[in-house]
C-alpha cells in the first residue's frame, strides 16, 4: 500500500528542499547552515593571525611621534563623512571591523585609551607582535596551552621587572604631568599646534591643581568647548565654566556681578503633554472666556512656582530643562538672568563648581542652597556666543575654548586634548616614568631573554618569543623615520648589553641616542596597561581552537524551512482537528 504524502510538506514553486545533513522524523535537518565555514585548531590560529597582522599593518604607520595620518571616508547616517586623523582610536570607531580577532584587538586598544588616555597603537602592535612571535613556537607542534602557560610566565616576570626600570624621581609633580601631556600629543598634531595645545593644557592643569585632578571627579574638571573662526593660538583657558546655551530673552541682563545662582533640577512650566508612554492629556475649551481664565490661572500657578526663587534673592537661575515663555518676561522685569537646557553631566559639573545644591522643587529652595560667582557674563568668541561664569565659589573646574579654521580640525584637536587630559590624570595618580624611544621595551626584552635560559621546558621558547615581540617595538619605531629595523635592533642590543638602559630611538635625529640626555620619557602606568591589555588579547586569541562562521541559506531553501517549521506529524494532526 502506497503511503500518502502530506502535500503541505512539499515545496512550493518559489521554494527548494535543502540537502540535509540528517533526517529527523522524515524531515530534513541541518546540523549547520549551508555555506557555514568552519576552521579548527591550526587553521583557526592561522586565520586569526592573518587578521591580527592586518591590524598591525593598519597601526604601525601611526606609531610614535613621526606618525603618518589616515584619511577616513565613512557614512554617518545618511551623509558621507570624511576626516583626517592620526588618532587610531578615532579610526577604529569609524571603520566597520568584522573579523572577531580583529574586533578583539580593536576593543583592547580602545579600552586602554579610554582608561589611560594613550597606548591605543602600542596595545595592537604589542599584541600582534606576541602572536607573530608565538607562530614559530606553534609550528613546532607545541600545544596551545603550553604557549599560554609560557605567556603567563613571561607576563608575571614583566610585571616584576617593569617597576625596577622606572626613572629616578627627580622631577616635581607639575613637570611630570607636563611630560605626560606632551607625550600624549606627540605625533597627533603638527609642531605649531602641539606647542599651543600643550601650553593650554599645562595652564589648565596648573589652575585646577594636582589634588583636584586626582580626585573622584577628575575626568570632569577640564572640559573643552569649540568655536570655528580664528586660529588655535587664540584659544582661551577660562578659570571657571563656559556655557554654550544662549540667553533666551533680549531684556535679560548680559552681565551679573556677585551672582547668587539657583540650580533647578527639572523644569519651570506646566508638565509637557506626554506624562509617560501610557498616559497623555490635552486641553479643550468650548468658550473663549474659559481659555482666557485658563491662561490667568496658568500664570498664577507659574508665579507661585517661582515665588521662592524671588524670595531668596537669586539673580541667576540655571534650569536643567525647559522654562515657560511667560517666565522669561517675568524674570527679565526683575533683572534676573535665566539659562535653560543642560545635559545632566554638565549640570552636575556646574553644581560642583558653584557650590550650589540642585533643587527639584523651587518651593524647597533656601538661601544656603544658592551658589555664587563673582561674574556671569555673555561674551562673543569668534562666530559664537558663550556665557562665562568666573570667580566660582568652589573653583574646581576649568574650561578651554578652542578656536580653529573649521569644525573638522577642531574635532580632531578636541579628541587629542581629551586623551591628553586623561593621560595627565593617569600621570598625576602614578608619577613614575620610564625611558621612551623604545628603551624600556628593549631593556625588558634583554632581561626576559636572560630569564628564559633558566626555564627547562618548552615554555623557554615562548618567553624568548615574548622577548622578541618586545624587541620589535623599537624596531617599528625606527621604521617610521626610515631606519633599518635590523640595524637598529643590533645597535640597541649592543648598547643595552653595556648597561646603557636609556638607549633608544632618537626620532628627531634619525639615530640611536640616550633618552636620559634627550629627556624622552613615558608613563609607566600607561606602559603597564598596554602590556596587560596586549597579553589578555593575545592569550584570548590563542585559546580559540574552532572558528565557525555561520552562513545563510539561499532564499528558496530559507523560505521552505521557515514555512515547514513546526510541521511535525503531531502538530499537523492538531491543525486538522481544529479544522474539523
What positions do the PLM features span?
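Short, flexible active-site-proximal loops enriched in glycine and acidic residues
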Residues: 115-125, 144-147, 163-174
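Extended amphipathic alpha-helical scaffolds
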Residues: 2-91, 155-404, 412, 568-580
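Extended, low-charge hydrophobic alpha-helical regions
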Residues: 46, 96-98, 399-401, 406-580
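Elongated alpha-helical scaffolds
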Residues: 103-106, 118-132
Amino acid at each position: 500500500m502506497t503511503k500518502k504524502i502530506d502535500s503541505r510538506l512539499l515545496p512550493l514553486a518559489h521554494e527548494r528542499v535543502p540537502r540535509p545533513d540528517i533526517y529527523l522524523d522524515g524531515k530534513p535537518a541541518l546540523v549547520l547552515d549551508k555555506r557555514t565555514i568552519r576552521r579548527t585548531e591550526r587553521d583557526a590560529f592561522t586565520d586569526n593571525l592573518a587578521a591580527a597582522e592586518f591590524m598591525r599593518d593598519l597601526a604601525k604607520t601611526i606609531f610614535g611621534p613621526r606618525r603618518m595620518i589616515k584619511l577616513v571616508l565613512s557614512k554617518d547616517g545618511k551623509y558621507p563623512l570624511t576626516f583626517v586623523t592620526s588618532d587610531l582610536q578615532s579610526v577604529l570607531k569609524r571603520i566597520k571591523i568584522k573579523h572577531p580577532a580583529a574586533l578583539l584587538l580593536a576593543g583592547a586598544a580602545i579600552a586602554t585609551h579610554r582608561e589611560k588616555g594613550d597606548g591605543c597603537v602600542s596595545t595592537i602592535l604589542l599584541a600582534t607582535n606576541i602572536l607573530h612571535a608565538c607562530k614559530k613556537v606553534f609550528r613546532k607542534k607545541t600545544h596551545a596551552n603550553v604557549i599560554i602557560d609560557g605567556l603567563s610566565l613571561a607576563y608575571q616576570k614583566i610585571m616584576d621587572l617593569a617597576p625596577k626600570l622606572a626613572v629616578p624621581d627627580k622631577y616635581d609633580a607639575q613637570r611630570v604631568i607636563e611630560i605626560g601631556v606632551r607625550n600624549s600629543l606627540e605625533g597627533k598634531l603638527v609642531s605649531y599646534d602641539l606647542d599651543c595645545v600643550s601650553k593650554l593644557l599645562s595652564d589648565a592643569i596648573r589652575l585646577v591643581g594636582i589634588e583636584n585632578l586626582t580626585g573622584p571627579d577628575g575626568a570632569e574638571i577640564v572640559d573643552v568647548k569649540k568655536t570655528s573662526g580664528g586660529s588655535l593660538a587664540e584659544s582661551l583657558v577660562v578659570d571657571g565654566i563656559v556655557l554654550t546655551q544662549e540667553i533666551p530673552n533680549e531684556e535679560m541682563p548680559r552681565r551679573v556681578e556677585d551672582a547668587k545662582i539657583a540650580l533647578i533640577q527639572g523644569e519651570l512650566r506646566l508638565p509637557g503633554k506626554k506624562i509617560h508612554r501610557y498616559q497623555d492629556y490635552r486641553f479643550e475649551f468650548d468658550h473663549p472666556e474659559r481659555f482666557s481664565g485658563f491662561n490667568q490661572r496658568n500664570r498664577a500657578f507659574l508665579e507661585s512656582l517661582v515665588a521662592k526663587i524671588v524670595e531668596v534673592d537669586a539673580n541667576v537661575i540655571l534650569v536643567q530643562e525647559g522654562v515657560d515663555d511667560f517666565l522669561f518676561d517675568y524674570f527679565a522685569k526683575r533683572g534676573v538672568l535665566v539659562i535653560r537646557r543642560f545635559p545632566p553631566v554638565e549640570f552636575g559639573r556646574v553644581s560642583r563648581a558653584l557650590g550650589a545644591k540642585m533643587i527639584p522643587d523651587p518651593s524647597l529652595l533656601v538661601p544656603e542652597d544658592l551658589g555664587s560667582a563673582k561674574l556671569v557674563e555673555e561674551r562673543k568668541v569668534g562666530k559664537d556666543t558663550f556665557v562665562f561664569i568666573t570667580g566660582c565659589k568652589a573653583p574646581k573646574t576649568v574650561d578651554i575654548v578652542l578656536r580653529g579654521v573649521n569644525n573638522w580640525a577642531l574635532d580632531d584637536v578636541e579628541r587629542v586634548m581629551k586623551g591628553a587630559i586623561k593621560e595627565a590624570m593617569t600621570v598625576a595618580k602614578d608619577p613614575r616614568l620610564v625611558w621612551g624611544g623604545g628603551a624600556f621595551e628593549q631593556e625588558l626584552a634583554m632581561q626576559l631573554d636572560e630569564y628564559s635560559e633558566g626555564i627547562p621546558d618548552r615554555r623557554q621558547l615562548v618567553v624568548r618569543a615574548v622577548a622578541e615581540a618586545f624587541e620589535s617595538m623599537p624596531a617599528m619605531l625606527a621604521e617610521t623615520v626610515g631606519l633599518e629595523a635590523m640595524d637598529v635592533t643590533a645597535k640597541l642590543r649592543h648598547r643595552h648589553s653595556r648597561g646603557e638602559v636609556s638607549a633608544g630611538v632618537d626620532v628627531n635625529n634619525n639615530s640611536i641616542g640616550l633618552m636620559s640626555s634627550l629627556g624622552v620619557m613615558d608613563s609607566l602606568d600607561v606602559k603597564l596597561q598596554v602590556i596587560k591589555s596586549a597579553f589578555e588579547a593575545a592569550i584570548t586569541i590563542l585559546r580559540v581552537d574552532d572558528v565557525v562562521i555561520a552562513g545563510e541559506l539561499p532564499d528558496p531553501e530559507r523560505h521552505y524551512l521557515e514555512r515547514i517549521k513546526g510541521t511535525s506529524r503531531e502538530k499537523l494532526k492538531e491543525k486538522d482537528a481544529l479544522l474539523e
